[in-house]
């Protein structure tokens, strides 16, 4: 499924780190019940949640693409300017689509990642944030057992 490759690329991006996406601000698959403490520091109003979706199998290959939605959240008490969220997504797009045949620490290698689209501007009443998501199609393979 290649979670490790994606998480590593996002976590190690200097551009994202400069926007405040450090440890604890990239949440794997609804990791936290409360939003990170983003409202204290106006230089760090963001966090993101990685939501792995369904995988559609092709019976000829016993595998298929899996969807990944990356939700970028911004504290609405700091800003209501969605262009700040758009700028984060613009950084994420080339990071992910540039991953080709990359092995991960979880025994999965990413074969390719394609952009699929972006959501409308949304509000999250639970996290009390403004947010958007970007969707990606990920093709990966298991590299620990030699399976293709």
Predicted regions span which residues?
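A broad, low-specificity signal marking well-ordered, structured residues that form hydrophobic/aromatic
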Residues: 47-48, 68, 113, 134
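Extracellular/virion structural assembly segments
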Residues: 75-97
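Acidic-leaning, charged glycine-interspersed low-complexity segments
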Residues: 94-148
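Small/polar-rich, solvent-exposed N-terminal microdomains that initiate assembly or binding
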Residues: 1-61, 99-106, 147-148
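Short intrinsically disordered coil segments
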Residues: 65-67, 87, 148
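Oligomerization/assembly interface segments of phage tail-like spikes and tubes
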Residues: 62-79, 129-141
